[in-house]
């Protein structure tokens, strides 16, 4: 990301140069960022040398970064082969680490939804809306969806508790029916058609991953040439 690139401009400008020359992949997440940063300690850092040689120098940070950038460009041009070897070593290390990479708990896979599974029943308010929405649209054809919803909400709030019970009881019956239907559905297990779709989706995902691996291998071969 942009912020991560900025954070390594001085302390490890080598990585930015290598990524710009497509010698090292840019990590798309924080976990992957740490993989590369841990390996960055093996790289030479002229910026640190500059600070040691000039401890009392008062320089603006922007000017300091500019100076580091110029120094790295000069070094990279002179010792290109050395940096290419280091980049390949970093890339190999990166790929080894990524093979054992486990996504954070927050990254959940999208669950497969069977279109034939029982649908959740609407709440009392939505049953009320489905009855009165056509009437409001007929009386106010120019109203936007948001305005229609606001009118329905106002009508619901002004409806007497006794009148609301009609919709609440209806919603309760639909909820009980849903509980029975979903229990029966789960007892039977996933239908064959749904299983086939899930298997097909998994195969497609595996095929995409294999194609990406082949592309990475091809890129490595091209770099070696």
Swiss-Prot record:
| Name of the protein described by the UniProt record | Nuclear autoantigen Sp-100
What Gene3D superfamilies does this protein's entry cite?
Answer: High mobility group box domain, SAND domain-like
Record PTM text: Sumoylated. Sumoylated with SUMO1. Sumoylation depends on a functional nuclear localization signal but is not necessary for nuclear import or nuclear body targeting. Sumoylation may stabilize the interaction with CBX5.
Coiled-coil residue windows: 157-224
Give me the stretches of Acidic residues compositional bias: 210-225
PROSITE patterns membership: HMG_BOX_2 (PS50118), SAND (PS50864)
> Segment Disordered: which positions?
185-225
The UniProt keyword set, sorted, is: Coiled coil, Cytoplasm, DNA-binding, Nucleus, Phosphoprotein, Repeat, Transcription, Transcription regulation, Ubl conjugation
Provide GO CC annotations from the record. Answer: cytoplasm; PML body
């Amino acid at each position: 990301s942009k912020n991560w690139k900025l954070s390594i401009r001085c302390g490890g400008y080598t990585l930015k140069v290598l990524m710009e020359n497509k010698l090292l992949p840019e990590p798309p997440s924080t976990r992957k960022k740490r993989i590369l940063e841990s390996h960055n300690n093996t790289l030479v850092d002229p910026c640190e040398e500059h600070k040691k040689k000039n401890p009392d120098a008062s320089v603006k940070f922007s000017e300091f970064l500019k100076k580091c950038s110029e120094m790295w460009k000069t070094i990279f041009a002179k010792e290109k082969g050395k940096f290419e070897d280091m980049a390949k070593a970093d890339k190999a290390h990166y790929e080894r680490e990524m093979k054992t990479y486990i996504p954070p708990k927050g990254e959940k896979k999208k669950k497969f939804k069977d279109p034939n599974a029982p649908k959740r029943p609407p709440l009392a308010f939505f049953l009320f809306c489905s009855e009165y929405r056509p009437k409001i649209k007929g009386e106010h054809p120019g109203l936007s969806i948001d305005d229609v919803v606001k009118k329905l909400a106002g009508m619901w709030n002004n409806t007497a508790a006794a009148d609301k019970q009609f919709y609440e009881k209806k919603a309760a019956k639909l909820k009980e029916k849903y509980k029975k239907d979903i229990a029966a559905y789960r007892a039977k297990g996933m239908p064959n058609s749904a299983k086939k779709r899930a298997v097909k989706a998994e195969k497609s995902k595996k095929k995409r991953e294999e194609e990406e691996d082949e592309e990475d291998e091809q890129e490595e071969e091209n770099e070696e040439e």
